[in-house]
């Protein structure tokens, strides 16, 4: 039942799923159950969407004091009754696609992947996974339920210091002895755990099993190359069934070059890996998986399209110096035994080095980098990525429109031209004494040739434009990751500047300010290494894309020319 509410503070939406509200604005709230600190409702302008639960109060009719106030509820709490990390039963609506309307998405849980995990894993492997692991890049549960959560499980729900040592943000703000925390708890800088890392609240681990090195290269910081490079092919998408044919799915054959045997994986296995990657690698642009669909998902064209895009996805994964070394990825590529698979799956889901803790795994160069120079480089890359994103979208739209013309308009026009030539040939046969069979046959053949050319145009996108669209789609996903990653670095810069100002004013020890600057260097080196890797891959991928497109275009028009030249020779000896 809809309830009336009142906005306690102003809130400005950052994406289409959220709506802006103003202080004292009257709201309609669809449900008083807060999930991950967000409510769904309607503002006074008739806009429907999400807004922070802590920014509103629910007004009960006739009882002015009896209302639910979320203003002290942290993001991730269920109203005033839940803790910071909800139990699995509370998280179930988000994972099942049911419950409140803003969580349901008919396109996210589709036939090929909506069955139980019993054929892959007989039980729930991480029952203590926090609800925060399901947060989206905007702080509320997105429709695809994918977010790199800052903390791995409920039992290490981010305890940076003992209770007596912990510096509460409000108390520390009053004392003015430490850098203030971001009051916007929905900021990805906060939710990712990077703020806590910068402020020194992420505890060092006694033993860190994995490390990733950054070194200085000719273009600045870069990831140290994988000492054991490899590739992986994806082949033979095969339709399989279970439950006596009631459910069906597509299985892909994966053959890594560094493993002895191929493995077979379904799309939902890829999806599991993808969410592990998002959960762990906070400052890395993880390539998006190709979309899944329910209607017609076993049609040949869709199967081929998904295969092409999974191949590109795998190519980017294996070429990334950090992602390719991830233990969960290696397990995904090589495990053949069911029992070992489940053990490795549980181990990946209980990984402690995720989110904020993942930043502890970096080994950075000793070279000094001026903070302003780094910020300038980040700003340049931000402008570049925005322009590239716009350009990729423009080229994608043009290429998609060209595909439609090839399949529809071009074929139709050439067929009309061919039919018109055929009509001329038939007309010439109407007066037998004056008809020329050789000429009529040549004109009729010309008509058939243009009909063939029309079919060639309809088939051509499979050889060039489809591959171009696949590459552009991959880069649209990669580019869409960078705004949040850059926001993390911007937040780190701000903390360094604030700490230095407080140190200059005598409100913070210089040693503490130096620690913040040192940890900011870690984030800065990681972002620059990721920017460097993106540029390297971009140059290779777009070179290959353009070469492939032009070669196929040349071959296509050569084939068209051969058809026309063959027809032309029929007129030589009339």
From Swiss-Prot:
Protein name: Sorting nexin-33
Keyword Protein transport: yes
A molecular-function term among this protein's GO annotations: phosphatidylinositol binding
Taxonomic lineage of the native organism: Eukaryota, Metazoa, Chordata, Craniata, Vertebrata
Encoding gene (name): Snx33
Keyword field: Cell cycle, Cell division, Cytoplasm, Cytoplasmic vesicle, Endocytosis, Membrane, Mitosis, Phosphoprotein, Protein transport, SH3 domain, Transport
Residue ranges, compositional bias (Polar residues): 79-90
Chain's role: Plays a role in the reorganization of the cytoskeleton, endocytosis and cellular vesicle trafficking via its interactions with membranes, WASL, DNM1 and DNM2. Acts both during interphase and at the end of mitotic cell divisions. Required for efficient progress through mitosis and cytokinesis. Required for normal formation of the cleavage furrow at the end of mitosis. Modulates endocytosis of cell-surface proteins, such as APP and PRNP; this then modulates the secretion of APP and PRNP peptides. Promotes membrane tubulation (in vitro). May promote the formation of macropinosomes.
UniProt source species: Mus musculus (Mouse)
Modified residues (Phosphoserine): 77, 92
Pfam families reported in the protein's UniProt record: BAR_3_WASP_bdg (PF10456), PX (PF00787), SH3_9 (PF14604)
Span of domain PX: 230-340
Domain of life: Eukaryota
Quaternary structure annotation from Swiss-Prot or TrEMBL: Homodimer (via BAR domain). Interacts with ADAM15. Interacts with FASLG. Interacts (via SH3 domain) with DNM1 and DNM2. Interacts with WASL. Interacts with FCHSD1 (via the F-BAR domain).
Entries under InterPro entries matching the protein: AH/BAR_dom_sf, PX_dom, PX_dom_sf, SH3-like_dom_sf, SH3_domain, SNX33_BAR, Snx9_fam, Sorting_nexin_WASP-bd-dom
Domain BAR: 371-574
Keyword Cell division: yes
Any one Gene Ontology cellular component term annotated for this protein: cytosol
Segments for region (Disordered): 79-116
Post-translational modification: Phosphorylated.
């Amino acid at each position: 039942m809809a309830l009336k509410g009142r906005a306690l503070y102003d809130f400005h939406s950052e994406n289409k799923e959220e709506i802006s509200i103003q202080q004292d604005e009257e709201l309609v709230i669809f449900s008083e159950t807060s999930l991950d600190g967000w409510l769904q409702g309607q503002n006074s302008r008739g806009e429907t969407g999400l807004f922070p639960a802590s920014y509103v109060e629910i007004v009960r009719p006739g009882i002015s004091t009896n209302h639910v106030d979320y203003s002290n509820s942290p993001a991730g709490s269920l109203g005033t009754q839940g803790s910071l990390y909800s139990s699995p039963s509370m998280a179930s609506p988000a994972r099942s696609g049911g419950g409140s309307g803003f969580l349901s998405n008919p396109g996210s849980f589709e036939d090929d992947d909506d069955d139980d995990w019993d054929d892959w894993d007989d039980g729930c492997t991480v029952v203590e996974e926090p609800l925060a692991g399901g947060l989206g890049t905007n702080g509320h549960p997105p429709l695809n339920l994918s977010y790199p959560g800052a903390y791995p499980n409920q039992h290490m729900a981010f305890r940076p210091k003992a209770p007596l040592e912990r510096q509460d943000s409000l108390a520390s703000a009053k004392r003015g002895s430490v850098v203030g925390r971001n009051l916007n708890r929905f900021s990805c800088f906060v939710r990712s755990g990077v703020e806590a890392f910068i402020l020194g609240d992420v505890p060092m681990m006694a033993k860190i099993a994995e490390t990733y090195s950054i070194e200085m290269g000719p273009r600045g910081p870069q990831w140290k190359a994988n000492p054991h490079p490899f590739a992986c092919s994806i082949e033979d998408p095969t339709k399989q069934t279970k439950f006596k044919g009631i459910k069906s799915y597509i299985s892909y054959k994966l053959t890594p070059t560094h493993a002895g045997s191929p493995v077979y994986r379904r799309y939902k296995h890829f999806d599991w890996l993808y969410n592990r990657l998002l959960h762990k690698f906070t400052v890395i642009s993880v390539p998006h998986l190709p979309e899944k669909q329910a209607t017609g998902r076993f049609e040949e064209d869709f199967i081929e399209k998904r295969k092409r895009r999974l191949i590109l996805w795998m190519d980017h994964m294996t070429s990334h110096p950090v992602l390719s070394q991830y233990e969960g990825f290696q397990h995904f590529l090589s495990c053949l035994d069911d029992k070992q698979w489940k053990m490795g799956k549980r181990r990946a889901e209980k990984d402690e080095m995720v989110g904020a803790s993942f930043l502890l795994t970096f080994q950075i160069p000793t070279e000094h980098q001026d903070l302003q120079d780094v910020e300038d480089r980040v700003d340049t890359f931000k402008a570049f990525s925005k322009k590239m994103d716009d350009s990729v979208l423009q080229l994608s739209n043009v290429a998609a429109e060209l595909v439609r013309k090839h399949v529809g308009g071009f074929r139709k026009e050439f067929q009309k031209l061919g039919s018109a030539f055929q009509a001329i040939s038939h007309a010439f046969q109407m007066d037998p004494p004056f008809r020329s069979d050789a000429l009529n046959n040549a004109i009729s053949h010309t008509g058939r040739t243009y009909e063939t050319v029309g079919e060639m145009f309809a088939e051509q996108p499979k050889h060039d434009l489809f591959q171009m669209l696949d590459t552009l789609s991959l880069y649209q996903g990669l580019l869409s990751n960078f705004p949040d990653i850059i926001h993390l670095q911007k937040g780190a810069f701000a903390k360094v500047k604030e700490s230095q100002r407080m140190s200059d004013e005598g409100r913070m020890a210089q040693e503490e300010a130096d620690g913040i600057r040192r940890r900011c260097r870690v984030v800065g080196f990681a972002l620059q290494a990721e920017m460097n890797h993106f540029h390297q891959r971009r140059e290779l991928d777009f070179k290959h894309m353009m070469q492939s497109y032009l070669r196929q275009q040349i071959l296509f028009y050569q084939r068209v020319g051969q058809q026309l030249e063959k027809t032309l020779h029929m007129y030589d000896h009339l």
